[in-house]
Amino acid sequence: MQYGVVEITSIENGKTAKVNILNGIKEGEPSHKWKLGSWNRGSGYPKLCTFYQDRFVVAATNKKPNYIWMSRTGDYPNFGVEKVEGTITDDSAITLPVINRKMCEIRHLIPANDLIILTSGNEWIVSGDKTITPTNCNLKTQTQRGALSCEPQFIGNRCVFVQE
């Protein structure tokens, strides 16, 4: 199977689209297996970004306000979960839905010893004890209060924010 990236320039009907090939596939080879990227005009683009453990981290689109995407390690524009010989590598990109009992909009990403994620209804961390990989990236909820949209601040080594 061949993978690639294209830009849709027009849609002819429910089964056919014209595209500009950006990379990875040959012209004139039709495919019935395709998927829209996470970010586009219809779904929106990330509202938040930061860097954490040599990954570019973005979050909160209009359609997925509770999602986080982490780039491949050291390859900041690459959010592809590329596989080598059928396995996910430690430097592969990561996509995380941040959800507990209810879906809450992510409002802040704060890089510290841990990656702090503040939402409209709760607070989370991605532990920085070990290097983050697709197989050990675990979200841990902290409280069920949530944060307002005003910018969190560090006072000493403490992150201070206004709760919902």
Model-derived segments and their meaning:
Residues K26-E164:
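Beta-propeller and closely related beta-pinwheel folds
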Residues A17-I21:
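SH3/SH3-like beta-barrel fold
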Residues E12, N23-I25:
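Residues that cap or initiate secondary-structure elements
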Residues M1-T16:
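Ser/Thr/Gly-rich low-complexity blocks that favor extended beta-strand/coil architectures
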